[in-house]
Amino acid sequence: MGVAVKGLWNIVLSGYPRSGKTMLAKRLIAENQYFARIGVDELREMLFNEAPPCRDEFLVYSMIADMRDSLLEKSYSVVIDSTAPDNITRQFLLTTRRKRVNRLLIMLNVDREVLVERNIEKFGDASAVVAWDKRWQKPVGDVPIFRFKSNSMEEFESYYARLKELLESEMHPFKPEFHRFPMPFRDVREALKNLLKKRNP
């Protein structure tokens, strides 16, 4: 059954590897013909065939922003499938050139032991979890957040039903008039560029 989304959405997924981000993103676009997914890891691999951080992370994120804004201009809601571990990256992905867009940061919450088990099953070890621990930040500021638990398929389905209800709602606390952009897009872009330079000199 499809999702009858109300309004235009820019949704950013943030979560550890194997937390269910891609499954959620693909579910959203499968159930709504006016949703489009941008996969950060897939774009990075397509351009450079490299794991993060690749040789030009700023180019990757600049292209993501351009694709996002082009899709929004064509009246497609966007879901950005990313790890987005820090607040500058989250803010960059949430800040659109187009106004009157519902912004939403979905934090994928999975218990650590479940994350470790899934990563060992997929990659053979839990090094990815440890690596992202060093960069992970709690969200701050006036950021609309939906916390999505995904420890099991039953829990995933329960939270997906809640998310679907939100997206179909006429009135919700994530409307653009209830939130201000803390910085213009140009300034957020510069902040991300500086962050990436420090991380990958």
Ranges and model annotations:
Residues 13:
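Hydrophobic anchor at the beta1->P-loop junction of P-loop NTPases
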Residues 2-6, 141-201:
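NTP-dependent small-molecule kinase module
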Residues 16-17:
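The conserved Walker
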